[in-house]
UniProtKB/Swiss-Prot annotation:
Record note on cofactor: Binds 2 manganese ions per subunit.
The protein's annotated pathway: Amino-acid degradation; L-histidine degradation into L-glutamate; L-glutamate from N-formimidoyl-L-glutamate (hydrolase route): step 1/1
Cofactor entry: Mn(2+)
Family: Belongs to the arginase family.
SUPFAM superfamilies: Arginase/deacetylase
Official protein name in the record: Formimidoylglutamase
GO annotation (BP), single: L-histidine catabolic process to glutamate and formate
Stated role: Catalyzes the conversion of N-formimidoyl-L-glutamate to L-glutamate and formamide.
Encoding gene per record: hutG
Amino acid sequence: MSVANDSASIWTARDDSGERGDTRRLAHIVALGQDAGAGDAAVLGFACDAGVARNQGRRGAALAPRAIRRMMAGLPAHNLRRLVDAGDVVCEDDQLEAAQDALAGRVAALLQAGAHPVVLGGGHEIAWGSFQGLRRWLDARGDREPVLVLNLDAHFDLRTGRPGSSGTPFDQIAEYCAARGHALQYACLGVSPLGNTPALYARAAEVGAVWVEDRHMQEAHLGERLAQLDALLAAAGHVYLTIDLDVLPAATAPGVSAPAPYGVPLAVVEEVAMHVRASGKLRLADLAECNPAYDIDHRTARVAARLAWRLLGGAAR
């Protein structure tokens, strides 16, 4: 495991300073090699696909943090005044557990500084590291308010096999919470019946998960879903939002390990994410499973960049 912060060459964008008005883009407001402060928007990369390999998936997600940053660089800053790039946690070979531990430490430090982090993955093994970071920060504060783990995903990722992989993070979170007496609030929205065995549905029921299948996550159901989400938010003190890009239709997000033949429209995914952000309870978000090795015209990286931009506060609701 190593930590890298060599993304200066990625943060480049056109210069429209000769035009009237605010022409800033994210590349013009990014802070490299600087500590995050209170209220700062921050991105942190998790360059890892060791968990995907362990889960018999297609490697390539380790390339995603750089690809997503490249698509973010030219986006207009709008409401953002400063964006801290906290670098990448890089997984060496199969040292997944060390990388997840390092990610947890970096996430906890950003939260302690008062920053608002979005983590750019990487395989969905990112979730186990992200959650541990949030939990470390809360534990250091003596905060035992319930945490809603909200996963927008075609898969439950509740596999019980070990060692951990991209298919196990929410089972690892469930075990962690059970061992420490924390209530687990796990919701998985966008579940594909084609991508989950009866055993995984049974495990979801066992851990008390709330789930909605992809066919009920279409635009026609948005009002019902937001009302359901409001009930979940009301019961939580904090929210960890994780978006697996394979929840989107393959035409929208072709560059993932397991493309979805049906999927949840981007408009719905984005509206759910913004609804969570507007609640004031979002502490941490991450984007998982972007795989540049299989992307088409940077389509998936562009979608990830848009979602990161919205989550960081790039545009008013």
